[in-house]
């Protein structure tokens, strides 16, 4: 029996593009260092990477993902692969099929999901870079592979559509298990602070027999509510489904300063959580309190978290995703790539590890 470690994760999917264009990172003393090394020195133990089918800019496709995944494995970090099943961002507002799949029938789409998922994982396996965990879809609250797998909006929120959506997800899960049955499956939605919507989603998946290992939630306070709402939701979902839960996307600003030519996604004081200013101290407090909430989930079912793009520094003007960097104040590095003191929150999280290990942790044991 192997106890699963508490995940202190980072999604660094932009790292490849930043490095290729000359961006770099430094430790607290200004010494240049490889990003993965810096993250590991900062107590991160897991990396999440997104994969797009055929992205315009070429980053986050299979070839580039293999190169980065090999580095993740060489650093001895836990690896979560996030399938978007799209050529671009898949999120609650966009779940568009890859261009190559646009004309497929529903049955062909199921086969495409299955074949593509298995091909990606087999390729990673050949390079000794197999993920430990896989997300079948990204923030799939509204379904995925629209419109075949769409469940958002009255017209699509029907039993029949949920069955079609679940059918696509099941083919993805089967493909993962066919390559390596040990890989854990995460199902990820965006409703960190919304218990009613979270229940609705996971109740549907339970009723439809979707078999997965871990609940993944995004939680951005300016979209998803208070930390109390997050805590209440995590507690309820743990008791209701008995599955480990990971807050698989979150972030908080270290500044509201906006360099010329940038417009941050979060740039208004009134969107901040009371008591958590947009400062390195505020960001640190946010992370400490968030990690405490995840650790306190009943039954030891709080499995950890991932910070979304802590290293997406504004190192250049044009990005392969077709829009400017809108995240540069939500990172854990300053605008020039120097590591912030907020990594200390992860260390504080680790110091609780001993008492954590003594808690009943059956659900996290393989």
Curated annotation (Swiss-Prot):
Domain of life: Bacteria
GO molecular function, one term: glucosidase activity
Keyword Iron in annotation: no
Keywords of the record: Glycosidase, Hydrolase
InterPro entries the UniProt entry points to: Glyco_hydro_53 (IPR011683), Glycoside_hydrolase_SF (IPR017853)
Pfam families: Glyco_hydro_53
Signal peptide: none
GO BP: any one term: pectin catabolic process
Catalytic residues, chain numbering: 139 (proton donor), 249 (nucleophile)
Family label: Belongs to the glycosyl hydrolase 53 family.
The protein, known as: Uncharacterized protein in bgaB 5'region
Lineage, opening ranks: Bacteria, Bacillati, Bacillota, Bacilli, Bacillales
């Amino acid at each position: 029996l192997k106890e699963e470690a508490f995940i202190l994760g980072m999604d660094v999917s932009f790292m490849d593009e930043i490095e290729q264009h000359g961006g770099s990172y430094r430790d607290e003393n200004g010494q240049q260092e490889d990003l993965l090394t810096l993250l590991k020195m900062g107590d991160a133990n897991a990396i999440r990477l997104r994969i797009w089918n055929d992205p315009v800019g070429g980053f986050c496709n299979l070839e580039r993902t293999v190169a980065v995944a090999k580095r993740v494995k060489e650093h001895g970090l836990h690896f979560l692969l996030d399938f978007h099943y799209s050529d671009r961002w898949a999120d609650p507002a966009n779940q568009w099929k890859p261009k190559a799949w646009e004309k497929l029938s529903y049955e062909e789409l199921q086969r495409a999901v299955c074949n593509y998922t298995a091909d990606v994982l087999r390729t990673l396996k050949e390079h000794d870079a197999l993920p430990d965990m896989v997300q079948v879809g990204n923030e799939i609250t509204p379904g995925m592979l629209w419109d075949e797998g769409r469940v958002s909006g009255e017209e699509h929120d029907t039993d029949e559509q949920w069955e079609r959506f679940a059918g696509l997800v099941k083919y993805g899960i089967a493909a993962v298990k066919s390559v390596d049955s040990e890989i854990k499956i995460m199902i990820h939605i965006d409703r960190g602070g919304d218990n009613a919507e979270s229940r609705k989603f996971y109740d549907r998946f339970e009723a439809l027999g979707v078999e997965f290992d871990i609940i993944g939630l995004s939680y951005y306070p300016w979209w998803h509510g208070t930390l109390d709402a997050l805590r209440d939701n995590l507690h309820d979902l743990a008791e209701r489904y008995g599955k480990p839960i990971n807050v698989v996307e979150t972030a908080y600003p270290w500044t509201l300063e906006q360099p010329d030519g940038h417009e941050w996604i979060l740039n208004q004081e009134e969107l901040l959580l009371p008591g958590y200013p947009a400062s390195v101290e505020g960001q640190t407090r946010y992370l400490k309190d968030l990690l405490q909430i995840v650790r306190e989930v009943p039954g030891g079912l709080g499995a950890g978290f991932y910070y979304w793009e802590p290293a997406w520094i504004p190192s250049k003007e044009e990005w392969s995703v077709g829009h400017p960097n809108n995240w540069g104040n939500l990172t854990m590095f300053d605008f020039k790539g120097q590591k912030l003191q907020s990594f200390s929150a992860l260390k504080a999280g680790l110091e609780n590890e001993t008492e954590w290990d003594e808690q009943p942790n059956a659900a996290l044991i393989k």
